[in-house]
Amino acid sequence: MLCYVTRPDAVLMEVEVEAKANGEDCLNQVCRRLGIIEVDYFGLQFTGSKGESLWLNLRNRISQQMDGLAPYRLKLRVKFFVEPHLILQEQTRHIFFLHIKESLLAGHLQCSPEQAVELSALLAQTKFGDYNQNTAQYSYEDLCEKELSSSTLNSIVGKHKELEGISQASAEYQVLQIVSAMENYGIEWHAVRDSEGQKLLIGVGPEGISICKEDFSPINRIAYPVVQMATQSGKNVYLTVTKESGNSIVLLFKMISTRAASGLYRAITETHAFYRCDTVTSAVMMQYSRDLKGHLASLFLNENINLGKKYVFDIKRTSKEVYDHARRALYNAGVVDLVSRNDQSPPSSPLKSSDSSMSCSSCEGLSCQQTRVLQEKLRKLKEAMLCMVCCEEEINSTFCPCGHTVCCESCAAQLQSCPVCRSRVEHVQHVYLPTHTSLLNLTVI
């Protein structure tokens, strides 16, 4: 089955997957080609029959979510935005930049005149490099008014000249830094109508839910702690909110389609879980619906049968867990690369495959395969002794009363519940494991 996936820079990728493939299979293949390990930040979008932008559920079959027949057209988009310093890979940072650039030029992110001047200079630097009077001015008008005043143009030129020698990657990072400080950074907007039929925009972001008019002028902001419950019924989404008086109020939002309503419901639940929770709960992970065939099979055959099961949410990790997972993956990739590299060979990318051969003279009687196996065991042993929170210090603390021993002393002191079983921590006991750093630092060869 063929899928056409468009990147934020309008480059089209052809992706071939199995006929029964889930969305995750397609996204993983795209990210693998781009060299991206931090897959959890991204998603695949498509356009519904009524023009609504919808997220593909990565845990369900692609063919069951799309209209028509293959090839299917999808868009690679950033689903969860994080602070630039939390992005570990330059490839990931570049896709973030492309998405942000597209949003800026489309007017989805509002910036002040001062920010527009600075961003115009940075965007020109990423596109053309150092200032050149023959080419740079054509990109200055993208963010500022079409007819630039001489003072505005001079300000942008001055800023651009100050960027001389700045690399494209550095300029892209500075763009992300500026945009991440904006009020609407990381907010996903949904077009709705209220109970009276008035057109509104609902923004779902890291801090809560924003209700705005069509021109983005704010009406109300709802923080996640005061949201009791979000539910969906047909084309409607209901939000139960606690008022300052302590009473509850139910807000009704009407969507253009049932799938659009499902998209808003998913956005509220998944965004809250990603940014505000320590881990994704099983209540979110395991929520699903069944089609008629699957429902009948579950009644007469087995309640746990997977036939006809469609998951409601596809989020697997929170922001903290994504960062930790990516750090471990990059660390592991770097260790494998160091093991497989000859002493005489030049430094290579930390993501380079470990297929390169090791000279037999360095194995000292062991075969190359045996050496790699032993090095892999050593790597796993060293990783197992690291704190699961910071991934830097050795494990030396036990949570009581549950008994899990997975953190260093400094991280354990900051946790109120065990990161493994989620039980409450009454106190932390320092422990002395039968290991020593010097032992783990021994090399096999």
Swiss-Prot record:
Its main location: cytoplasm. Can bind 1 iron ion per dimer. Iron binding seems to decrease LDLR degradation activity. This is E3 ubiquitin-protein ligase MYLIP. The gene is Mylip. It is found in: Cytoplasm; Cell membrane. A zinc finger (RING-type) spans 387-422. Residues 350-363 have a biased composition (Low complexity). The RING domain mediates ubiquitination and the neurite outgrowth inhibitory activity. The FERM domain binds phospholipids and mediates lipoprotein receptors recognition at the plasma membrane through their cytoplasmic tails. Expressed in developing and adult brain, hippocampus, cerebellum, cerebral cortex, thalamus and substantia nigra. Predominantly found in neurons. It is an enzyme of class 2 (transferase). Autoubiquitinated. GO terms for cellular component: cytoplasm; cytoskeleton; plasma membrane. E3 ubiquitin-protein ligase that mediates ubiquitination and subsequent proteasomal degradation of myosin regulatory light chain (MRLC), LDLR, VLDLR and LRP8. Activity depends on E2 enzymes of the UBE2D family. Proteasomal degradation of MRLC leads to inhibit neurite outgrowth in presence of NGF by counteracting the stabilization of MRLC by saposin-like protein (CNPY2/MSAP) and reducing CNPY2-stimulated neurite outgrowth. Acts as a sterol-dependent inhibitor of cellular cholesterol uptake by mediating ubiquitination and subsequent degradation of LDLR. GO terms for molecular function: cytoskeletal protein binding; ubiquitin protein ligase activity; ubiquitin-protein transferase activity; zinc ion binding. Its EC number is 2.3.2.27. Keywords: Cell membrane, Cytoplasm, Iron, Membrane, Metal-binding, Transferase, Ubl conjugation, Ubl conjugation pathway, Zinc, Zinc-finger. The keyword Oxidoreductase does not apply. SUPFAM superfamilies: PH domain-like, RING/U-box, Second domain of FERM, Ubiquitin-like. It is a peripheral membrane protein. It catalyses: S-ubiquitinyl-[E2 ubiquitin-conjugating enzyme]-L-cysteine + [acceptor protein]-L-lysine = [E2 ubiquitin-conjugating enzyme]-L-cysteine + N(6)-ubiquitinyl-[acceptor protein]-L-lysine. It comes from Rattus norvegicus. Fe cation binds at residues 360, 363, 368. Residues 431-433 are annotated as: Critical for homodimerization. One of its GO terms (biological process) is regulation of low-density lipoprotein particle receptor catabolic process. Residues 341-363 are annotated as: Disordered. Homodimer. Interacts with the E2 ubiquitin-conjugating enzyme, UBE2D1 (via RING-type zinc finger). Interacts with myosin regulatory light chain (MRLC) and TMEM4. Residues 1-279 form the FERM domain.
